[in-house]
Amino acid sequence: MAQDVLTDLNKVRNIGIMAHIDAGKTTTTERILFYTGVNHKIGETHDGASTTDWMEQEKERGITITSAAVTSFWNGNQINIIDTPGHVDFTVEVERSLRVLDGAVAVFDGKEGVEPQSETVWRQADKYEVPRICFVNKMDKLGADFYFTVDTIINRLGAKPLVIQLPIGAENDFVGVVDLLEMRALVWPGDSKGDVTMGAKYEVQEIPADLLEKAQEYRAALVEAAAEASEELMEKYLEGEELTVAELKAGIRKLTIASEIYPVLCGSAFKNRGVQPMLDAVVDFLPSPLDVPPMIGHDPRNEETEMTRKPSTDEPFSALAFKVATHPFFGQLVFIRVYSGQIASGTQVINSTKGKKERIGKLFQMHANKENPVEEALAGHIYAAIGLKDTTTGDTLADITNPIVLESMSFPEPVISVAIEPKTKGDQEKLSTAIQKLSAEDPTFRVNLDEDTGQTIIAGMGELHLDILVDRMRREFRVEANVGKPQVAYRETIRRKVEKHDYTHKKQTGGSGQFAKIQIAIEPFTSEEGVLYEFENKVTGGRVPREYIPSVDQGIQSALTDGVLAGYPVVGIKATLLDGAYHDVDSSEMAFKIAGRMAFKEAARKADPVLLEPLMEVEVRTPEEYMGDVIGDLNSRRGQMQSMEDASGVKVIRSLVPLSGMFGYIGDLRSKTQGRAVYSMQFDSYAEVPKAVSDEIIQKARGE
């Protein structure tokens, strides 16, 4: 049975489940696994027993950190699900899972509507053009309002929702949904307490009389929207003919795959209502690997040559590694999405990103943290592979005789760091193992050595991110270490162009000396793609031999790691090599590298250097009576108010606040609002630090 499904890609769906931190995403995934027969006992996040949350910290904190890939079957279709974390510190996990998905289910909290993190994840899905259906969850919750949530999809996301279900009853009285396609009511009858037993089937009933008019109105809108999918449907619709359910589904599917509309369903995953129709919608409306455009990549031997791979087993093998995880028995597991061709376990492939040959040891289809071994990996599917030594997130694996490099993923720079000091020499060794493994798993986790203090500095996307990384070092790698206070990842840049700056590096110490002379220009530089540095060579007439030019570039880049103001990394620089001179005997790559480094340091001092700090977009939801205190407090943290609006009985305040002002904010907010306000924050951009604050940071960094 499973094998038949695997080869017919029309019946395969690779989907993600994406949402705000508490919209009930993991519970929804759990229910899907239950209904598709994979789990016999249901796991609840709040009991710490859910299948996809399998790391110890996830179970303790009740949040999903790593996206587990799980395979399940529904009515003869195969659904591969990636559960993505909703917490903003784990953006990298969301980014990389969206990159390999074909479609997604966006889960919203029926009371809160679109929350800040739902907005972030939605924008990421837009970036990768992932078609979505929406599931308005928690319809049994006090204050749940389906129609308000649909409005927030329009107003906050600027998206075009297409309602294909209406809720029957709300809060405690929520019993089922109206299926607008078939115009019928689906009701999950409860027991004496109103609870639905796990796996209970729904009953098909007549639409309740009080909802009939509303259902007809929404169905008319649905038919009109579906008719826009093709000229034939439009013609039929305009001539007043009835469109069949199959035609409506085909129209909605076409528009969903084109990301023109987003079908909206509703339910309560926790109360087991609405999950089966949502699975039907995944199959009906989300794309199969065959509906997605062919993958584009380039020839590893020549970046200019564009190549494509269709999702077929007849094409040469190509796959993208989108996640690395450490497994207790197998060591390193690499999750791959196979885009074309097929590969048997034990075969040699090439990591075309790094130009290294790799052997695929064993292949598995994953079930959260249970493995199901398979003999071969086929196009259109997601697998975990063991035995890959040099492959990290974003690398392409390809057929040795016909390699391709697929488009990789871009990850944000970390904004916060802590110093970590191992307690003993033995811990130092364990720490380096831990760092090596964790940075292979997580591209947003960075490590560097502070040369002045000898401390190891680890950097990440937020306090929770670093907490969990440190926690994993202690638990998984048994590292005993002292961890410093979180520090802000400041940056440095320049404001002014320096037209030309000369530097000569000369050293005479008996025998051959060192000589390099260069003239450089530096200027502020910004790029759309987030590139932080650019080097241009304008030397003519061989005044600097070609083999030394990369050394100048390397020297300048080495100077960018510690800026002239306070030793922070330098960004937003364009450097141009204008002229130079060399000596036949005394010039060397080393001499030009030193010249590049020193020339940049001197030029940067003349280029009006400034400090940059990360600004966070902070959103606070507070009852009105505390609004004044909350705003006053944000202002005292150098916050800049962006907007204020009302949402379901609370005030929503949006402000841009420097990260340095946000440490420990949660405690202060709780005490100011008696624990009634909640906030979320995410990185927005880097901005110049005001002079008074900047002077203080520089003095501290220089130890004055």
Swiss-Prot record:
Its main location: cytoplasm. InterPro entries: EFG_II, EFG_III, EFG_III/V, EFG_IV, EFG_V, EFG_V-like, EFTu-like_2, G_TR_CS. GO terms for cellular component: cytoplasm. Residues 298-313 have a biased composition (Basic and acidic residues). Keywords: Cytoplasm, Elongation factor, GTP-binding, Nucleotide-binding, Protein biosynthesis. The keyword Protein biosynthesis applies. PROSITE patterns: G_TR_1 (PS00301), G_TR_2 (PS51722). Residues 293-313 are annotated as: Disordered. Residues 10-290 form the tr-type G domain. The keyword Chaperone does not apply. SUPFAM superfamilies: EF-G C-terminal domain-like, P-loop containing nucleoside triphosphate hydrolases, Ribosomal protein S5 domain 2-like, Translation proteins. It is found in: Cytoplasm. GTP binds at residues 19-26, 83-87, 137-140. Transmembrane segments: none annotated. It comes from the Bacteria. Signal peptide: none annotated. GO terms for biological process: ribosome disassembly. HAMAP family: EF_G_EF_2_B. Catalyzes the GTP-dependent ribosomal translocation step during translation elongation. During this step, the ribosome changes from the pre-translocational (PRE) to the post-translocational (POST) state as the newly formed A-site-bound peptidyl-tRNA and P-site-bound deacylated tRNA move to the P and E sites, respectively. Catalyzes the coordinated movement of the two tRNA molecules, the mRNA and conformational changes in the ribosome. Belongs to the TRAFAC class translation factor GTPase superfamily. Classic translation factor GTPase family. EF-G/EF-2 subfamily. This is Elongation factor G.
